[in-house]
UniProtKB/Swiss-Prot annotation:
Any one GO CC term of the record: nuclear speck
Compartment list: Nucleus speckle; Cell projection, Lamellipodium; Nucleus; Cell projection, Growth cone
The name this protein goes by in its record: Protein Abitram
Function: Actin-binding protein that regulates actin polymerization, filopodia dynamics and increases the branching of proximal dendrites of developing neurons.
This protein's UniProt keywords: Actin-binding, Cell projection, Nucleus
Biological processes per GO annotation: dendrite morphogenesis; regulation of actin filament polymerization; regulation of filopodium assembly
Subunit (UniProt): Interacts with F-actin. Interacts with G-actin.
Organism of origin: Homo sapiens
Higher taxonomy: Eukaryota, Metazoa, Chordata, Craniata, Vertebrata
Family membership: Belongs to the ABITRAM family.
Cross-referenced Pfam families: GCV_H
Molecular function via GO: actin filament binding; actin monomer binding
């Protein structure tokens, strides 16, 4: 009796892939490989995360601490949002710093907003357990949630790359590093 070939199980997309569109900002502020990923929901809310190629997510890196204290007068933890129209939210530009990540090797990385809008919340869980940022960067290890202005919600993706474009950038980087070796 011949056995039927097993049908391959259909790949179920993750929650993030199902409900969010991934956008990428490579080399933020001109810093090589410091790439950010913006997860945009259909309701226009954007979740700021680190891209897979960010140096913090590479093997061997250990996060010592994370700080939302941007300057002496500005802390993203002081952001208090209330009401239907999200009063009290801090307004962010594309280059506004969200947090600083300090690694055990002395390296310091600043995570920027990448989108203009209001800061809805920051992820306080990564302050207490920084390893979440490396273990689950797209889900529990997110940096912040930003709500773009309604009028600008379509145009925020103009300076960002799609998943396919970002993969092409990654291939070019790999080819450039192997060519110089």
């Amino acid at each position: 009796m011949a056995t039927e070939p097993e049908a391959a199980e259909p790949v179920v997309p993750s929650l993030v892939d199902r409900y969010f569109t991934r956008w990428y900002k490579p080399d933020v502020k001109g810093k090589f490989c410091e790439d950010h990923c913006i997860l945009q929901h259909s309701n226009r809310i954007c979740v700021i995360t680190l891209a897979e190629s960010h140096p913090v997510l590479q093997s061997g890196k250990t996060i010592k601490s994370i700080s939302y204290q941007i300057s002496t007068n500005c802390s993203r933890l002081q952001n208090k949002v209330s009401g239907k129209f999200k009063r009290g939210a801090q307004f962010l530009t594309e280059l506004a710093p969200l947090c600083k990540i300090y690694c055990s090797d002395g390296e310091e990385y600043t995570v920027s907003s990448c989108v203009r809008g209001r800061l809805m919340e920051v992820n306080e869980n990564i302050l207490h357990k920084p390893s979440i940022l490396q273990e689950k960067p797209s889900t529990e290890g997110y940096i912040a949630v930003v709500l773009p202005k309604f009028e600008e919600s379509k145009s925020i993706t103009e300076g960002l790359l799609t998943q396919k474009q970002y993969e092409e950038v990654m291939v070019k980087r790999i080819n450039a590093t192997t060519a110089t070796s």
